[in-house]
Amino acid sequence: DWNRPIENGPIANGFDYYFGTGTINFPPYTWIENNHVLDIPVEMLNLRETKPGEGSWECRPGPAAKDWNINLVPERLTEKAVEWIESRKGRDEPFFLYFPLPSPHAPIIPDEKFRGTSGAGAYGDYVVQTDWMAGQIIEALERNGFGKNTIVIFSSDNGPETYAYPRIENYQHYSMGVLRGLKRDLWEG
């Protein structure tokens, strides 16, 4: 029942506010605010028909809100994070903003305005978009008076997928940096 509150989600686990999706590449494809679905899924979406810029698609078919566009997810999440920061302006109380970026994780789907900007293929373009997203949040912190009293932690959970090897061959782009290996390897990459 899409009208029922979501149990055991971020709000039930201590967050004051939540906006997002369950994950970018698994259904249901709809926005969730606090503990409610904003747009009830009314169609079945098969994103496997669309090809990512690089690698495998990694999207599961499933229920979606009308006119759901997976390509707009990163920018919409960024807009909402900036809006939330702006809503805190003038408040003299600490806050915690958790912003789990969907990029540059698969599916590799850089927005059109970032395509061709990196010289390192679709993944590089998605990294440029990720940098832009992080920059928007940092600019919002600065603009709203939080820049000098805020700790920003930017981290990653693993190294690149196996399709990093063609990226090395095609663009001489080593997304694992100086580390050895890739995701699921025994090495640190």
Locations of the language-model features?
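Short C-terminal domain-edge/linker segments immediately following a structured domain
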Residues: 25, 47-54, 127-133, 184-187
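Formylglycine-dependent
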Residues: 1-93, 101-112
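Short linear sequence elements within intrinsically disordered, low-complexity coil regions
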Residues: 20-22, 119, 128
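A generic "alpha-helical surface" signal
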Residues: 72-79, 121-128, 132
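Beta-strand elements within well-structured catalytic alpha/beta cores of enzymes
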Residues: 81, 95-100, 127-130, 134, ...
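Histidine-centered active-site microenvironments of extracellular/periplasmic hydrolases
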Residues: 2-13, 107-110, 116-126, 139-189
